[in-house]
C-alpha cells in the first residue's frame, strides 16, 4: 500500500503517567530494527498501555484502503463522514490519531528523529534515515493495534 509511510512492531519499555490525568508518555523499542525508538503521548483512558505490551504502529498518509492517485493533492480532496459499510484502514486498528510532522532532527550520521503533534499529544520516532525516508513534513494518521 502506498498510503503506508511507516510500519513496525514496538515493545513498550516504560509507561510514565507524568502529571496528566488521562495521558501517559510511553517509551518503546522496535522488535525488528535495532536503532528504532518511539516516544509517544497516548490517551490511556481510550487505549490503556502497560510495560511489555507489543504494539503495531503504522503511519499513513490516508485511511483509504486503495492507493491514492499521485495527483490527488490535499487541496482537491474533501472530507466526508464514512457511509455505512465503507471500510477504511482505521477499521483494522484500535487507536487512531491525526496530526502533523513538525520537526526533523539529525541524531547521528545514520539516525534521524521525526516529531509529530496530534492535537497536543506528541510523538518522537527515531530510526535509520533509510527506514524513515517516506516521512515528510505533512499531515498523517497514526494507527496503533495490539
UniProtKB/Swiss-Prot annotation:
Modification type N-acetylserine: residues: 2
Alphabetical keyword list: Acetylation, DNA-binding, DNA-directed RNA polymerase, Nucleus, Phosphoprotein, Ribosome biogenesis, Transcription
GO molecular function ontology, one term from the record: DNA-directed RNA polymerase activity
One cellular-component annotation, GO: RNA polymerase II, core complex
Residue list for modification Phosphothreonine: 68
Top-rank lineage group of the source organism: Eukaryota
Family note: Belongs to the eukaryotic RPB8 RNA polymerase subunit family.
Protein name: DNA-directed RNA polymerases I, II, and III subunit RPABC3
Species in which this protein is naturally found: Saccharomyces cerevisiae (strain ATCC 204508 / S288c)
Taxonomic lineage of the native organism: Eukaryota, Fungi, Dikarya, Ascomycota, Saccharomycotina
